[in-house]
Amino acid sequence: IDEIDKSDDEFEAFLLEILSDYQVSIPEIGTIKGQIKPIVFLTSNNTREIGDALKRRCLHLYIPFPDPFLEEKIISSRVPEIDKNLKIQLVNFVQGLRNLDLKKLPSVSETIDWARSLVLLNVKTLEPTLVRETLNILLKFQTDIDVSDPEIDNLIEQSKK
C-alpha cells in the first residue's frame, strides 16, 4: 500500500483488522477470512504521523536517498540515452540540492524525470538559465525554488567537480 500516510483514520482501522486478524469485515457481506496470511508492504513519505497500533504491526525500514554512485546507476538504467557527463553533473547537482533546507527534497523519481527532460532538450551540460527554467521538475514547492535560486550557480560549479 503506497503512501499510507496519505490515508485517513478509517482506512488505518481497516488495515488493523487485516494485519491483526487476517480478515475483513464488510457490513453488507460479513467477515471474509484470508486463506493465507498476507504479506503487506506499506510505504510512507512521513507527511503525517501513523497511528501507534498500526506501527506495532509493522517492521520499519528506512531507505535513505542513494549515494551518487548508486543514483548514477539508477539514472543510467532509466535514462540510458543520457550523456555520461550530464548524468554525473545532474546527480551531483541533485545531491547538492538535498543538502539545502527544503520543504521536500527531490526524490529519485524526480531526478529521473529531470534527466529525461534534459535529454529531450538536447542538453549536454547544466547552465544556470536552463536549471532555473527546469527546476520545477525537481522541486514541487515555490518556497523550495526560492530557497534554491541563490545557490544554483554554486551548485552547478560544485556539480562539475
Predicted feature residues:
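C-terminal regulatory/interaction module of P-loop NTP-utilizing enzymes
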Residues: I1-K161
